[in-house]
């Protein structure tokens, strides 16, 4: 059964042929509610639309009329019931942090911690490990609250199974945009998975084996998170992440001195560069950011989209999915795709970036998707679930149990693994195709960056990820490009599980027989990668 045309691709790149926009007849009826803010932004953009941009928009609309007709401009807020403050074990307010001033080396007064935090607060509760049985370690869950914008981000923290007083802390982000990081928790790298009958199954390769891990549902209205408004671009989400981490480490200072790392997959290839840059921009911070890890990410569309045809046509190490005529059609379509992406890169305008996303996803992802083959794993068909994995239904069922929601303090009325409307809102803002790779050189000046990719993924394939790291302009580019791919082996048994190249602060890793979600397909290899990376095994040389 082929992927549903309305499918949102897990963790990141959604094939957008169904999520295209048309002009509304009237904005006036829709602008009463704050959650229609993307519409207001669109109306403002209309005022500055050039004739050339409008012509491009209309051209793409004519090519894919059905897609435009199925457009959705907004998402409704999630039903929720906020708990009394007395039901939480800890509450910390950003205003209290902002009120602390210190004297710097020059004798000048400055805030102890930078950033605009007054509007934020953090609620936390201890999760009794014996109630759910997900893991035996210390756990906290709760919400970051933005009281001004009425945004509430849910998180779930698991302490390291090994040495939590000294082990690193890792933030994990799924992509979408619009997919819950709790799917990563229970399907990929968390302490347990969910079985078909919604039972807990211990994961011996959990990433909290040697690190404490925070799973965050973001942006708002994803998973257990909620809001009466909306976040529809990556940069806006970055401010929330900085606030969350600042308040979390202030409330739990026992974790603030260890090294901190941001990790994620797919659309996190957009998120992580921006989030890391936001954190590093603050001189006075309590976030000890030491590295970032991006798995099968979408970061540089101009480079990565060129490699859809090779991956689909047997040049990525796996048999071809498409026939010769389909491959030729993709070859013919790419120059137009590249031209549209270049226009997006040059202007970063919604009117350039949205058509680029629409055309390129239809031309470069659509032919593969229509075969019914799994876009996350070229080795297998998609199956009956519209997102190709039955586990997502099992996880959704488990996280909708009343006893589970009560145990973690969830305030929404229902949990969904992925919110399709969030995906469309990000597309509406032109976020999909923007050049977030341009942020990476500034990050490389300060901390190491790992780009890893399972080599059986199609949607954010290893060919494209390797290519964009080699196309990136940064001071260490020459040495990085001259570095050779070497075998990556499991310590102890010497089994080769991938290849890696590294120079300076930049590392790329190809993991054999892993799909879009490497920890799901290759749990042992993914944990080996994480442990080696956190230990500095790739960049110290």
UniProtKB/Swiss-Prot annotation:
Signal peptide: 1-17
Propeptide, residue positions: 18-125
Alphabetized InterPro entries for the sequence: AB_hydrolase_fold, Peptidase_S10, Propeptide_carboxypepY, Ser_caboxypep_ser_AS
Keyword Protease attached: yes
GO biological process, one term: proteolysis
Function according to Swiss-Prot or TrEMBL: Vacuolar carboxypeptidase involved in degradation of small peptides. Digests preferentially peptides containing an aliphatic or hydrophobic residue in P1' position, as well as methionine, leucine or phenylalanine in P1 position of ester substrate.
Official protein name in the record: Carboxypeptidase Y homolog A
Organism, as annotated: Pyrenophora tritici-repentis (strain Pt-1C-BFP)
């Amino acid at each position: 059964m082929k992927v549903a045309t309305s499918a949102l691709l897990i963790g990141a790149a959604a094939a957008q042929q169904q999520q295209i926009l048309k002009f509304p007849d009237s904005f006036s009826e829709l602008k009463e509610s704050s959650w229609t803010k993307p519409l207001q932004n669109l109306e403002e953009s209309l005022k500055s639309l050039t004739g050339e941009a409008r012509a491009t928009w209309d051209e793409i609309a004519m090519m894919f009329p059905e897609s435009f007709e199925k457009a959705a401009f907004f998402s409704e807020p999630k039903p929720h019931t906020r708990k009394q403050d007395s039901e939480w074990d800890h509450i910390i307010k950003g205003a209290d942090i902002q009120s602390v001033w210190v004297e710097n080396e020059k004798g000048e007064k400055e805030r102890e911690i930078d950033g605009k935090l007054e509007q934020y607060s953090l609620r936390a509760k201890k999760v009794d490990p014996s109630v759910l049985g997900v893991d035996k370690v210390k756990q906290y869950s709760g919400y970051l609250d933005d009281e001004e914008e009425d945004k509430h981000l849910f998180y779930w923290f698991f302490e390291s199974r090994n040495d939590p007083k000294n082990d690193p802390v890792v933030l994990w982000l799924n992509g979408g945009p619009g997919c819950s990081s709790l799917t990563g928790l229970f399907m990929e790298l968390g302490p347990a998975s969910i079985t078909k009958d919604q039972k807990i199954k211990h994961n011996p390769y959990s990433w909290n084996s040697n690190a404490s891990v925070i799973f965050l549902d973001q942006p708002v209205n994803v998973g257990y998170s909620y809001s009466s408004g909306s976040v529809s671009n990556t940069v806006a989400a970055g401010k929330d992440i900085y606030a969350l981490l600042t308040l979390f480490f202030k409330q739990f200072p026992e974790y603030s001195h260890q090294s901190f790392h941001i990790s994620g997959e797919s659309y996190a290839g957009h998120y992580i560069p921006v989030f890391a840059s936001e954190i590093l921009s603050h001189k006075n911070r309590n976030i000890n950011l030491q590295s970032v890890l991006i798995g099968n990410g979408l970061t540089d569309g101009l480079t990565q989209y060129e490699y859809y045809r090779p991956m689909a046509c047997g040049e990525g190490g796996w048999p071809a999915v498409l026939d010769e005529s389909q491959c030729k059609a993709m070859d013919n379509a790419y120059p137009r795709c590249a031209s549209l992406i270049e226009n997006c890169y040059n202007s970063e305008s919604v009117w350039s970036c949205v058509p680029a996303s629409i055309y390129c996803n239809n031309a470069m992802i659509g032919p593969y998707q229509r075969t019914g083959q799994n876009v996350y794993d070229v080795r297998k068909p998609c199956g009956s679930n519209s997102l190709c994995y039955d586990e997502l239904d099992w996880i959704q069922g488990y996280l909708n149990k009343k006893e589970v929601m009560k145990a973690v303090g969830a305030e929404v009325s229902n949990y969904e693994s992925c919110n399709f409307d969030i995906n469309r809102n990000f597309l509406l803002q032109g976020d999909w195709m923007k050049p977030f790779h341009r942020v990476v050189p500034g990050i490389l000046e300060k901390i190491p960056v790992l780009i890893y990719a399972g080599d059986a993924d199609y949607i954010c394939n290893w060919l494209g990820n390797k290519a964009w790291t080699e196309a990136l302009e940064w001071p260490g580019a020459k040495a990085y490009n001259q570095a050779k791919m070497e075998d990556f082996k499991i310590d102890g048994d010497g089994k080769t599980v991938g290849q890696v190249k590294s120079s300076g602060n930049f590392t790329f890793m190809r993991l054999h027989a892993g799909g879009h979600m490497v920890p799901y397909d290759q749990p042992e290899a993914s944990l080996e990668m994480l442990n080696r990376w956190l230990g500095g095994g790739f960049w110290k040389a």
